[in-house]
Amino acid sequence: MISTFILVIAAVVSIFISRVIPQISVNYLSLLVGMVLFCVPILGNHIEKFNSEIFIGLIVAPLLFFEGQATRLNVVGQEFKHIIQTTVVLVILAMIVAGFSLAALGVVSLPLAFILAAISTPTDATAMESVTNGLEMPTTEGTFLKMESLFNDASGIILLNMAVLWYANGYINYGQTMMDFMISAGGGVLFGFVSAWILVLSRQVWLRSSYNALNASLLIYIITPFILYYAAEALHVSGIIAVVVAGLVHNAEAQRSRLLNSQQVHFAFDLVSMITEIFNSMVFVVLGFMFIQILVNDHFGHGSLNFLMIGVVLYVSTVLVRY
């Protein structure tokens, strides 16, 4: 709880600084605040050890849900072919090229090379906004990247889990791997779509009744991505895909609800905007904190050159596959 409070305050501070210095992206400022946070013992010592499962469930899942809600469902339908190409074909191809390229260096084993490749292949909407801040992005390319960033986190996580199993077991079952991929991705889509529509229909009935309470309705809406993510993971389907699809369905509801209760929808959008901004900032605060933590703990020793080579190969391989 103390860790969360400190990270939220750090995120708010970085957002405030970005208002004072608008020329610098808030994400870069959040990185810097995270680095400073580690250097202040009275604060840094209260930050708990990083837990990837908690981070994905409590930060990444709601972020993707709200990003999905900002995207029209019909746009996804129009760009479905490109989404499949970028989130499945491109991600798998990039992972294969990067994985074999890393293994060719002789620094890491083939399974470990594929683990690193799976981590590096997905794009990130937040990082893209930071890099393109102040620049003009072509509309078509911007749309493709936005659509890709909604779904390829799920592809990357699924492929990462498969690479980890390969590393742990010492072999890979291609048929079972493809089947698991289809079940996880397809199950996530189905679960997210059905669950979201049940929630949407229930909320619409509630809105039309005399029992409608703004605070209760907003609370249910805010906790929706957390519930859907952990429920999907409990069913062994992709929780990330489930929350993205649920967000898209909620966008369709929001368009319809504006005619019924515009005040409530406007308030919900403002609340979501605030939460998204804080969560995005928290991601980079954590990244900055961990970066300094790794340096201080001397995780970069005599093998630093190997790490640098791995990073360069991953970057070059991904760029070559994409362009």
Regions found by a protein language model. Give the residues of each.
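Transmembrane helical cores of multi-pass secondary ion antiporters/exchangers
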Residues: 1-323
